[in-house]
Amino acid sequence: MNNSNSSLSFFSFKLSAMPVLILFLLIAPGILGINFIPPAKKKYKPGYIRMVFKNTVDGAALVMNDSVYTNVFGENYRVSKLKYYISNPGLKNSILLQKEKNGYHLVDASAPASQSFIFAVRPGEYHSVFFLMGVDSAHNCSGAQTGALDPLHDMFWTWNNGYVMVKLEGLSPVSPAINQRMEYHIGGYKGRDKVLEEISLIAPSPIVIKAEKTTEVIIETDISKWWQFGNPVPIKGTPICATPGQMAKKIAENYRNMFSLLPGSIIK
């Protein structure tokens, strides 16, 4: 009996002492001047992605001013200006999404240096490229800005307090407008007039990003899709669209299909 009582007493002592032990373990580091430092996150050396935009018409390189092109309606036209905004570009796979922070780029067909840009991403294999065609709503309402969003680039409507997301200008003999001009300034960032288009392009093969290396991908922008890809927009019927509204939305629904990711990528 004595042995049994001794065992019970010892067991009870252990239980009663447990909270004290736990408390000691919690406060001891502070008393002894020991700071608990969580394990550092594993750092990685970034790789880089260069996105190159190749402007074409039916697969052939776009030549400004001189070349005559024919749309799906048999209408001839020349292009004198093509500019469009690419915002917040990035890469993704099934578990990882990497996006350029505050990435705003104005691609200008007459300025080769504007047709590519580079940013850092985590090394790995990615399966698709994504970006916003246009400028997000927040930056349409942020007042005067710099860089690609500077109003001096002639892509901002002061009268409407918003950006022109895409601008296509030129001439066409079928245009009933003055001087046979065609002019498409597509904008609208809120409500039913919103023309912002989220673009996601599946890569034909994995896009491999290696640490401290640059991988180049080429995105084709084929403006032949502008005229008809769900919404017929013949030049003769609509030579000019320069305000937000239903026609601008129809054109935006067409031009979202202009983009395709060309096969292969180059690691440099």
Identify the function of each model-found stretch:
Residues 1-44:
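Bacterial Sec-dependent N-terminal signal peptides
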